[in-house]
Amino acid sequence: MRYLAAIIMCMVMALGVSAADKGLKGRVIYVNAGHGGWTANDRPLATINHEIMDTLGFFETKTNLWKALELCSKLREAGAEVVMSRTKNGYVTRGQANATALDRVETDADENGQQQIVGLERIACQVDSINPDYFISIHSNAHVDGSPVNYLVLMYRGETGNDYAKGSIERCKQAFPYIWDNPLSSWTSSSPDDPYIAGDITWMGGTAPGKANRLGYTGYLQVLKHRVPCFLAEGSFHSYQPERHRLLNRDYCRMEGVRYYRAINAYFGGKPEKTGYIVGELKDAAEVMNHPLFCYQKDSFDQYRPINGAMVYLVDERGVAFRAYHTDGEWNGVFVFDDVKPGRYTLRFEAYGYHTRTEQVVVEADRTAYVMTQMHRVISKE
């Protein structure tokens, strides 16, 4: 009898290990990239290089999708089955009064037959029907434009302290430290020790329990009204203008997607990545920005002028530069190296009119090394 009990215990432990080792393989993850159209409702904002409504400039539609696409790519690599509400930009609900000539109705499919859904109740109904293992809605937030306010907030369906889809608070608490890990964002408040995690009714100033949708689920945010434990992530404030300029860099948005991936992967006990990342920002050592569309937090690193068009070289221990990154012209100074093997490296920075600079960096597996550095101008002797 004791022998049989031992065998049963071994079988149970083996099953437990198998389930824990499974990670994301076979999991169904639903990813909603918030917004979808090129309308005035899709958070267009002016930047130094782009007027408002310029699709090459800032639209939350665009930046949300960049984040979501990277997240979904990583999830699929890990064996998850991924459902996206949309995979393209420029889709609106039927009858959208603010639709532009660039927008199409959401029921249209792309060239691969992927239906594009942006109607929030339709998304909620699809999520409830699929009943995935995980749901996330990706957004960025807004305050008064030019305000220094910038923080991360995760919202779940319900009242603060009372999640209507049980398990949502747990998922928010687990995910928050991973998503928050980005010093470039220059957070003004909220941290892993004091996270902004809230019920959507409470945060949005609604009245509990909120209006029910066609499925009978109550709450405030339409996209969360389904049975799946979930949250909506306001990843940062695009009304904080330096952050808005960073969001014009697709690689910067991709790295937010990586942080979402790390949170979800860890939640399901997935294996950590074997490589790491280097993410940084390159600024002038002395010149302070002076532009009405670049209001920065007092005494922050954001006050300094980003260096456009610089070359950043990744140099190995042999002194060989084996990768390079060209900072864009969008006034952010962002540079990114992904899929970097763990080890010690040197970053070499070169830009016209500046002294060459080097920085040492250590890359760890499944981690991001952040580098915020400045370059000194060459002083003319004339």
Model-derived features: positions:
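A short, solvent-exposed beta-strand micro-motif common in secreted/extracellular proteins
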Residues: 343-353
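Active-site-adjacent mobile loop/cap segments within catalytic or ligand-binding domains
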Residues: 27-30, 41-44, 137-145, 155-156, ...
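Extracellular beta-sheet/turn segments enriched in Thr/Pro/Gly and aliphatic residues
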Residues: 357, 362-382
